Swiss-Prot record:
EC number annotated for this UniProt entry: 4.4.1.21
Family: Belongs to the LuxS family.
Name of the protein: S-ribosylhomocysteine lyase
UniProt KW keywords: Autoinducer synthesis, Iron, Lyase, Metal-binding, Quorum sensing
Encoding gene (name): luxS
Length: 169
């Protein structure tokens, strides 16, 4: 099985909260696609709550589009990581890590402005596979933690696992 890009970086050295360009690729027509690792928690040290990450999934996707989409950027998808330490965001375009970090922080401010659970988009059995597994309070706690900590940048060159280590794993 091929080694995926996300498993060639040393998770023990990742900062969080932090933005990392996980991958660059191009479509056959030449459009740039960028995948970002939006790391909310330090891997193997902390984890996002089940209800909090699920609620963020519903809120974050819209808020990030509000703050980042433009003439040269369009978000394709924002999905939670299975390890529950962050989200992957795929988009058309090549915004800087700083642009993404600023949009992320603005989105967290928006999460704090949501007043009631009923304001969470798609919070119903027709549009959500586990619509009862939400917590606005937990999502807002996560948002407050991100805002308080600020968002830094993780660079692949700083996190790259050596061929020697990869060979031993």
């Amino acid at each position: 099985m091929p080694l995926l890009d996300s498993f060639t970086v040393d998770h023990t050295r990742m900062n969080a909260p932090a933005v990392r360009v996980a991958k660059h690729m191009s479509t056959p027509k030449g459009d740039a696609i960028t995948v970002f690792d939006l790391r909310f928690c330090a891997p193997n040290k902390d984890i996002l709550s089940e209800r909090g990450i699920h609620t963020l999934e519903h809120l974050f996707a819209g808020f990030m589009r509000d703050h980042l989409n433009g003439s040269d950027v369009e978000i394709i998808d924002i999905s939670p990581m299975g390890c529950r330490t962050g989200f992957y965001m795929s988009l058309i375009g090549e915004p800087s890590e700083r642009q993404v970090a600023d949009a992320w922080l603005a989105s967290m401010e928006d999460v704090l402005k949501v007043v009631e659970q009923s304001e969470i988009p798609e919070l119903n059995e027709y549009q959500c596979g586990t619509y009862e597994m939400h917590s606005l309070e937990q999502a807002q706690d996560i948002a407050r933690n991100i805002i308080a900590a600020g968002v830094s940048v993780n660079r692949n060159d700083d996190l790259k696992l050596s061929d020697e280590i990869l060979g031993q794993l």
